[in-house]
Structure formats: C-alpha cells, structure tokens
C-alpha cells in the first residue's frame, strides 16, 4: 500500500531540479482535506450546516461550511510558509501571506464545491489549482500572479467527500487517485494514471433550465435522448448538482458535464479560475476535453478573479459533439 505522501516524494525524485516545495504544498492541501473531512462528518452536530449571514462577491449567500473550509485551507497553506498567497471563491480579493514573499507558488481554490447539498448528505468537494507566480520572488504577490491561463497550471486536483473521501490530482504527468483511510489517517493510492473510458454514455446537466439554454445545447440534449444503436444512444442522464461529484462519476464511468450560459447568466455560472481551469487540466490529463463551447478552457486569458464561463467537460468525443451543435445551431 502506497500513501499519498510516499507517492508525491517518489514522483519528486523523477525531476532532478525539484526542490520539494510543491511536495510540501500538496501535503498542506492534504492536511486541509483531512480537517474538512472530519468536520463534514459531524457537521449536523456542531452547528455548521445551513447558510451564514454573509454574502460573497457575487452576491450569493455563503454556507457556514464554505467559510469553515475556506479558513481551514487558508490556515493549512499559510502555516507551511511555501505559498505566497491565495485566491478563493469565498474571498473578494486575493489574500497575500505576509512573510511569504520568498515563496514561488500561488493557490486558487473552491474550498467546498456543492456546499448547498451538504444539508441533504450529498457528496461535496474541494477544488484546487496551483501556479508559479509571475511577479519577482521576494516581493508581495499581486492579482497578476493569479490571472494566468489554465495552461500555466503546475498542479490541480479535487477532493470528493462522499461514501469515502478521495483526493485526485495531477502535476501534468497523469491523474492519480487516493482514498482516505480514517483508521490510519492517510490517503492511500487506489488508481494511477486514470483515463476516461473510451466511450461515454452519460450526460450531466440541470435540465430544469432547458428553456433558458442556447439552441445548440438544446439540440445536443435531444441528440443524447434519441435512439441510435450505432452510437449507444440514448445516453443516461445523471446530475448531482455538485461539480466535483458529477465530474468524478463521469471520469470513472464516461460522460460529459455541461453548464452552459443562460439568460440569467449569459457568461455562464461556473468560475473560470476556481472550477473550470483545474477540472479542465485534470480532464485533459485523463484523455478528455474541456471547452466553453467554442474555445479550449485552458487557453482562455482570465480578466478578473471571479470571471464566469460556460463549461463542457468530459469524454473528448462528447465535448466535440457539443461544440459541433453550438456551431451548427447558433442563437438568433
């Protein structure tokens, strides 16, 4: 049995110029995930379920667990002295870590994706993304360090808190999965070099918003529902409402996750930096594809910290089909 710590160190030795800083950073995220796992499992007993009295920069009411997870991850990262600053879905601005100007990495994160589901015991997750800063080491980080395209990511991953807690990550050399053993307090390797199945048969989208979708997406949904034995259609519809949980299922079983623009969210709803980029990096490393319907997600130049985007991610052939329908059936 190989632990996450052992696996990370083993991979570090494959790079002659590795300094160990990224290893320490991933270990800090691992610690934060353990703390969140522990408290999610007793959330109903310690009054951290439900909404708080605060709103985030998008005007959304923050869940108590959102704020809790944000603070725990922030503390775990700051304590290691190897991160210059963070950007979080739960923070209005970047958070600069004083005394860490020498650090060369920054972290972007969604501390608890799908947190509105926690009250009903549905899987939730943590998403993280790591970049090398672009401003000089030795100076405080600025917003410029965080507004980098996804193709500049050094590492990305997510933790899914479900029937078991799993951590999945990539450093650009494949996607690897680890399952948390609470009796030992360690994440153990359960799958190395994960890949999307060759064919996907599941589509994940909130069809309750169908009337608000672009024409191309409506046509694609109908395509998924049509019978065609040559393409194994109709596809199965599965939607949890937690990006991490939906993506994880599709990664294992094959499928596509769709969150298009709507009349109320013309730019899309998911955050480019905290959700789309890390999941796109993972998808491509697992042989999949991620797009906003027209453009590769990882090539998009971000303009603001909380920028939103349409998001289609999963099996390559399924994302290709969505892009084709969007091209062929543009909105009037």
From Swiss-Prot:
Reaction catalysed?
beta-D-fructose 1,6-bisphosphate + H2O = beta-D-fructose 6-phosphate + phosphate
A GO CC term assigned to this protein in UniProt: cytosol
Q: Name one GO molecular function term.
A: magnesium ion binding
The UniProt keywords, alphabetically, are: Carbohydrate metabolism, Cytoplasm, Hydrolase, Magnesium, Metal-binding
Where Mg(2+) 2 is bound, by residue? 110, 113, 275
- Which positions does UniProt annotate for substrate binding? 113-116, 206, 239, 257-259, 269
Annotated residues that bind Mg(2+) 1 are located at 89, 110, 112
A GO BP entry is: fructose metabolic process
According to the UniProt entry, what is the EC number of this protein? Answer: 3.1.3.11
Q: How does it assemble?
A: Homotetramer.
Describe the family membership recorded for this protein in Swiss-Prot or TrEMBL. Belongs to the FBPase class 1 family.
**Protein name, as recorded:** Fructose-1,6-bisphosphatase class 1
Source organism: Salmonella typhi
Taxonomic lineage from the root: Bacteria, Pseudomonadati, Pseudomonadota, Gammaproteobacteria, Enterobacterales
């Amino acid at each position: 049995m190989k632990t996450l710590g052992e696996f990370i160190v083993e991979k570090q030795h494959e790079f002659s110029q590795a300094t160990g800083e990224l290893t320490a950073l991933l270990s800090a995220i691992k610690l934060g995930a353990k703390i969140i796992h522990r408290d999610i499992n007793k959330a109903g007993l310690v009054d951290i379920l439900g909404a708080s009295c605060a709103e985030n920069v998008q005007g959304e009411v923050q869940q108590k667990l959102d704020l809790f997870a944000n603070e725990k991850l922030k503390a775990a990262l700051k304590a290691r002295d190897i991160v210059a600053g963070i950007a979080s879905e739960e923070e209005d601005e970047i958070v600069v870590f004083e005394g860490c100007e020498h650090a060369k990495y920054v972290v972007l994160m969604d501390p608890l994706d799908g947190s509105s589901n926690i009250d009903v015991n549905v899987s939730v997750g943590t998403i993280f993304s790591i970049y090398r800063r672009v401003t000089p080491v030795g100076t405080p980080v600025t917003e410029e360090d965080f507004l980098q395209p996804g193709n500049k990511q050094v590492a990305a991953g997510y933790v899914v808190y479900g029937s078991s807690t799993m951590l999945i990550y990539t450093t650009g050399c494949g996607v690897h999965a680890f399952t948390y053993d609470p009796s030992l307090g360690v994440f153990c390797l359960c799958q190395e070099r994960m890949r999307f199945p060759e064919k996907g048969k599941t589509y994940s989208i909130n069809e309750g918003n169908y009337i608000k979708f672009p024409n191309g997406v409506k046509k694609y949904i109908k395509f998924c529902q049509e019978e065609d034995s040559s393409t194994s259609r109709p596809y199965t519809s599965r939607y949890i409402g937690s990006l991490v949980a939906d993506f994880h299922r599709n990664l294992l079983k094959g499928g596509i996750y769709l969150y298009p623009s709507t009349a109320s969210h013309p730019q899309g709803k998911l955050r480019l930096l905290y959700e789309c980029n890390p999941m796109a990096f993972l998808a491509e490393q697992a042989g999949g594809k991620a797009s906003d319907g027209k453009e590769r997600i990882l090539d998009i130049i971000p303009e603001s910290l909380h920028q939103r985007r349409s998001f289609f991610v999963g099996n390559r052939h399924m994302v290709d089909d969505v892009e084709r329908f969007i091209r062929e059936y543009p909105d009037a």
